Structure formats: C-alpha cells, structure tokens
Amino acid sequence: YPGICRNLSSAERDERIAVGTPHALRLKMDKAIAATGPLIWHDAEAGPQHARPAIFGDVVLARKETPSSYHLAVTVDDYLQGVTLVTRGQDLFEASHVHRLLQALLGYNSPAYNHHKLLTDSQGNRLAKRDKAQTLQSLRAVGYTPAEVRALAGW
C-alpha cells in the first residue's frame, strides 16, 4: 500500500465514504510498532520468533464490504475462545507477525503456534479446496494408506 489516503483529514475521509468511494480501515504500522515495542511469539517448529509485522506495511483491518479482515478476525476469535495453541499451515507463518502485534495492541496474551507442513501433490502444489485439489477422501478412495498420506505431508 503506497499510503495514498493515509493522511487524509477526517472531513476528506467522511466525504469520500459518503459518495461511496471504496475504502479500508488500515493499521498505521509504524505507530502500532512504536506503541508495543519489540514482540516475540513462539512456534513449536521454528522456536522463538521476533515479530516483524512491518513486512506487511499498513495492514487492512476492515473494508467497506468486509467488516473484519482475516488478521483481525482470527486474533479476536482465538482470544475469545481461549485458544492457547494455534495450529495453521506453513503458508500462514508470516501472518503470525501481524497477529502478535494485534494481540499486543488489544492487550491479549500470545498463544503458542504450530505451523505444519502442507500436503502437496506430486508436482509440489499444495492440496487446497480452492484449487479443486484432491481431498483426503479421494486419496483414500483410490487406495492411499494413512502412512502414504502422512508421507505426502513429509512425516
């Protein structure tokens, strides 16, 4: 995000919103980091991690059509549910830097994390529903054993 609307006045923001201009609520990353200072989170595989949320720039917290971003939603949801161990795929490892920052800003304790390997096909593409990849059920249907499925995950 190049910061085009970062320093609009309240009046300018209100005017743009009133006429239906698409808009987003962003976290001013530099101010957020200054407010929390250095942060650490712990991953079961990778060990202690120094949070580097600045790699994302001013992250979106909400949009006109989406009342809450993934980052904000999972941070609040995990807290409200009392989650103490967050288990997600390795593809979401970097997002944890932002989540740790949001936890600190909201006064939440940081849960432990475990970012697991992803199941991939023979070409190394992850098995994802959105890509219409094979499902575990389809792998079982063609005869994959539990041990073979674990081998796909690198275990």
Protein language model annotation of sequence segments:
Residues A141-W155:
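Extended, charge-rich low-complexity interaction segments
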Residues Y1-A128, T135-R140:
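Active-site cores that bind ATP or allylic diphosphates and position pyrophosphate for catalysis
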